[in-house]
């Protein structure tokens, strides 16, 4: 019985950082495809942008955390050039209330862009999360099968 418990702990809690990164990367790739599809469906204009890619084409996946440290996490986001645009779409904007000199603007505080909350809605969507979990389970199964062969 103890051998079974030790084997289960070795597979689950004692995973190496590389194995955790493989599992989370599989889920992050699926989520990135969903983000790209959602932005293409709702915010894409079919026009020639030249060398400047559209926001939907700027979704990136990195196999590290937000700070760039490899600890088994994977991050989905946008390139540096487009992240601020995604923030405007996600959260919306308001006009400033006061000028730099402290005077109040005529229409201060009015909403200029309504937030779309695309990424938040995708995170809360059970269909998308089930796809992410399935991809992670497939990667996890490959790691377990590889360990069992050794």
Predicted feature residues:
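Mid-chain, well-packed structural core segment of small domains
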Residues: 67-92
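Short, Lys/Arg-rich flexible segments
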Residues: 1-73, 98-150
């Amino acid at each position: 019985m103890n051998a079974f418990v030790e084997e289960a702990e070795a597979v689950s809690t004692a995973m190496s950082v590389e194995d955790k990164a493989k599992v989370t990367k599989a889920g992050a790739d699926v989520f990135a495809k969903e983000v790209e599809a959602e932005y293409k469906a709702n915010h894409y204009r079919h026009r020639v942008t030249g060398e400047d890619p559209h926001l939907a084409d700027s979704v990136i996946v990195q196999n590290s955390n937000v700070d760039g440290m490899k600890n088994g996490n994977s991050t989905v986001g946008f390139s540096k050039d487009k992240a601020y645009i995604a923030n405007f779409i996600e959260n919306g904007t308001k006009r400033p209330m006061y000028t730099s000199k402290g005077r109040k603007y005529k229409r201060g505080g009015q909403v200029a862009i309504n937030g779309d909350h695309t990424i938040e809605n995708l995170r809360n969507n059970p269909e998308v999360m089930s796809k992410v979990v399935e991809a992670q389970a497939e990667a996890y199964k490959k790691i377990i099968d590889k360990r069992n062969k050794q």
